[in-house]
Amino acid sequence: MDISAVVIVVSLISLAYYLLMRPDLRQGKSAKLPPGPYPLPVVGNIFQLGDKPNRSVTKLAKKYGPVMSLRLGSILNVVISSPEMAKEVLQKYDHVFSSRFVASSWTAHDHHNVSVPFLPVGNRWRKMRKLFRDVMLSHPRLDGGRAIRQTMIKNLYEYLLESSKTGKVVNIGAAATITSVNLTSVSLFSGQVFHFDEDESTEFKETFEGLTIAAGRPNLSDFFPIIKPFDIQGCKRQMAFYLGKLLEMFDKIVNERLKEMRTSPASARKNDMLDTLLDFCRDKENDMSLNDIKHVLVDLFVGASDTASRTIEWAITELLLHPDILAKAKEELKNVIGENKLVQESDIPNLPYMEAVIKEVFRVHPVGPFLIPRRLEEDTELSGYFIPKGTQIFVNVWSIHRDEKVWPNPESFEPERFLNNNIDYKGQDFVLLPFGSGRRMCPGVPLAHRMLYTMIGTFIHSFDWKFEPGVTPEKVDMNEAFGIVLHKAVPLKAIPIKA
């Protein structure tokens, strides 16, 4: 059978599947789905997304409303684009909308069966969630790791200082990635995995970057489940390769720790997150294996590192484009910390303007423009609309953060908008949702909070900056690229000048 015949057969099968699965046909004409653009046969509204779904979906939501239907392939999606409706989904009816959609790539190595973000809400998920919230990422545990994280901040400072002496152009995103990865790794297992002075190509770096790229690739299997077994784009195979390598690396780390505990039990204990996971694993009631620990480390590692580094790159970009805002942030740091000192986690409560800057970065540049999609396990009703079982629910953070009824001049970067209110990003204010809300909210907020303040503070407290040669503020590319997180399409590069 030639390729054209294969395409015809697949299209006919997909069309039949599409017609059979259409909820409006299954439920009859009385089923009132949310409004949305008319879907084409088979492909639905896929071609209306373009390469910037955050912008195209937000534009569609302005036309069709805060509860909108989109058909992507054979999958019905409902997009939530207002704070009020987000509260309905994430808080009031979160028990109905708590199941997560699992992308095909994340089923590699059965990762979804262990991963806290994808586990169904049940006893195991509750135990893991409690472990994260009350033990691993609790303030006392994080306070205990301050000193080793501060060493990573000092490494960043020394790299920037050396670059300032030689006039070296710094790739801000790359420097932020190295530091955020190290801040995460020392918190997890007391080990530094990246170094500023090493070659660009290392096994760990290649694996980490490969995994984030694989996880962010659009996959037709997620839109057309009927072709999922064939993995026609190789997305799952690529994910399996990099995820497998990362699991092998974590396997070595776990086994080395266990060996140390057997030979030198007194000195082997680091009181880091790996120790906590091993303690949890020893209690048979918790139903966790050593293999599960490796998968948990993957979630924590990827979630914390990539989100923090991309947010920092956006933050430094906005500060360099707004010298008045940068000057205010630097003045606050000088008054609170003093000159020739590094920002420390203990300084965070005394930096209200920095807090406003970070909130505004979250608002204007949410690295997760859509929260991880939910999947309905039963037919339900929302805002008077019928939502059938199997529907994916997207919370459109990008649109909510640009709601003109809440945010005057929503496209402008204005940290001052947060100085006279108590709006926060920890899940209680549905106008600002960088980490989500409710029972499925990201558990890593306490660690990310500390990482962002200390890293952004280090970039700007002791250094002034100028753009790389040939680049002026007017030429800075502010386009975003869509992937596992939303990142700058063109990396920010600048030269540090010791202040």
Curated annotation (Swiss-Prot):
GO terms for biological process: terpenoid biosynthetic process. One of its GO terms (molecular function) is labd-13Z-ene-9,15,16-triol synthase activity. Mostly expressed in trichomes of leaves and fruits. Its EC number is 1.14.-.-. PROSITE patterns: CYTOCHROME_P450 (PS00086). Pathway: Secondary metabolite biosynthesis; terpenoid biosynthesis. It holds the Pfam family p450. GO terms for cellular component: chloroplast membrane. It is found in: Plastid, Chloroplast membrane. It catalyses: peregrinol + reduced [NADPH--hemoprotein reductase] + O2 = labd-13Z-ene-9,15,16-triol + oxidized [NADPH--hemoprotein reductase] + H2O + H(+). It comes from the Eukaryota. Heme binds at residue 442. Its main location: plastid. The chain crosses the membrane at residues 1-21. Keywords: Chloroplast, Heme, Iron, Membrane, Metal-binding, Monooxygenase, Oxidoreductase, Plastid, Transmembrane, Transmembrane helix. This is Labd-13Z-ene-9,15,16-triol synthase, chloroplastic. It comes from Vitex agnus-castus. The gene is CYP76BK1.
